[in-house]
């Protein structure tokens, strides 16, 4: 996560300078900052009309096991192994991590630390452009087929309502940005590896974007984009993301681990499990969420007409 003591503009790589988490704003924070370098909302498939822009609402999606089946970094590692960037022993390590992630449905701190060390050692001395190009290729070969259809429909629902849709993930920024771009989303906040003159140094900028770090990132993004967090929605599979889920007006547990499922039931959060209900993902999105997004779109349209 890129953290500084001020709010700045995205740099040339598209990274966002985030406010310091030392003094976070209240959950309904908003600001007059205008969006910078933001793609236009994506219209519904088959439509030539842009949806009305809903400037104060957004949706935040975790990636691993929420949007993507399993770990996006492991899928990336598989693609690199196929290109002989890694040894057979490394491939077995990736497969073991993937199997454990799918079996337990939750992250392990030791796995996260070990993965970080290996990833930083791998990218040190390599160009950012090379990693971005590899990410594009591996997305097409592996990751595209791992997107949960139900979660993809949810992202489109928010886009159709004219809302921003962001990926908030521990996944390396370059890969997260590729996924967001391919799905037509607004953008991504991910773990940032330091680079100098387009070459990775093998060090992180800040820490892995994980747990409370995601909540700090979302708060800062809300200030930057003028969002009202009470009107925003967050999606995750992991109990580790409770700080982020607790910030917004609507929290949704997607393919939740046991602890998140229990908490979601306790707090009355929506639960969607596409692992055991793949057909339901094709039938439609939750009615309450759909109505909320549609209501936001209508409100934005009414506001636009009144201003004319």
From Swiss-Prot:
InterPro entries, per database record: HAD-like_SerB, HAD-like_sf, HAD_hydro_SerB1, HAD_sf
Protein name as annotated: Phosphoserine phosphatase SerB1
Gene3D superfamilies listed in its UniProt record: HAD superfamily/HAD-like, SG protein - dephosphorylation function
Family: Belongs to the HAD-like hydrolase superfamily. SerB family.
Cofactor(s) this protein cannot do without: Mg(2+)
Species: Mycobacterium tuberculosis (strain ATCC 25618 / H37Rv)
Native organism taxonomy: Bacteria, Bacillati, Actinomycetota, Actinomycetes, Mycobacteriales
Subcellular location: Cell membrane
Entry-linked NCBIfam families: HAD-SF-IB, HAD-SF-IB-hyp1
Topology with respect to the bilayer: Single-pass membrane protein
Transmembrane segments: 280-302
CDD domains xrefs: HAD_PGPPase
Residues reported in the UniProt entry to bind Mg(2+): 62, 64, 237
């Amino acid at each position: 996560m890129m953290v500084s003591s001020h709010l700045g503009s995205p740099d040339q790589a598209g990274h966002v300078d985030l406010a310091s988490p030392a003094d976070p704003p209240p959950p309904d924070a908003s600001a007059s900052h205008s969006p910078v370098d933001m793609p236009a909302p994506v219209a519904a498939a088959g439509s030539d009309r842009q949806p009305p822009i809903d400037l104060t609402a957004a949706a935040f999606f975790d990636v691993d096991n929420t949007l993507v089946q399993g770990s996006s970094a492991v899928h990336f590692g598989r693609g690199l192994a196929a290109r002989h960037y890694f040894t057979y022993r490394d491939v077995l390590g990736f497969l073991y991590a993937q199997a454990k992630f799918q079996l337990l449905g939750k992250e392990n701190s030791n796995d996260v630390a070990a993965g970080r060390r290996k990833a930083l050692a791998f990218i040190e001395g390599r160009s950012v452009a090379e990693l971005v190009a590899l990410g594009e290729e591996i997305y097409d070969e592996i990751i595209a087929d791992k997107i949960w259809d139900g979660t993809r429909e949810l992202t489109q629902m928010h886009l159709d309502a004219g809302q921003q849709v962001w990926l908030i993930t521990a996944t390396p920024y370059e890969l997260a940005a590729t996924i967001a771009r391919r799905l037509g989303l607004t953008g991504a906040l991910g773990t940032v590896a330091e680079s100098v003159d387009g070459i990775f140094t093998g060090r992180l900028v800040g820490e892995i974007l994980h747990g409370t770090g995601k909540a700090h990132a979302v708060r800062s993004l809300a200030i930057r984009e003028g969002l009202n967090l009470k009107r925003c929605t967050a999606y995750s599979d992991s109990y580790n993301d409770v700080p982020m889920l607790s910030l917004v007006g609507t929290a949704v547990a997607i393919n939740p681990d046991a602890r998140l499922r229990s908490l979601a039931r306790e707090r009355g959060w929506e639960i969607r499990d596409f692992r055991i209900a793949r057909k339901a993902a094709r039938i439609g999105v939750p009615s309450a969420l759909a109505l909320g997004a549609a209501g936001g779109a209508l409100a934005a349209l009414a506001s636009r007409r009144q201003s004319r």
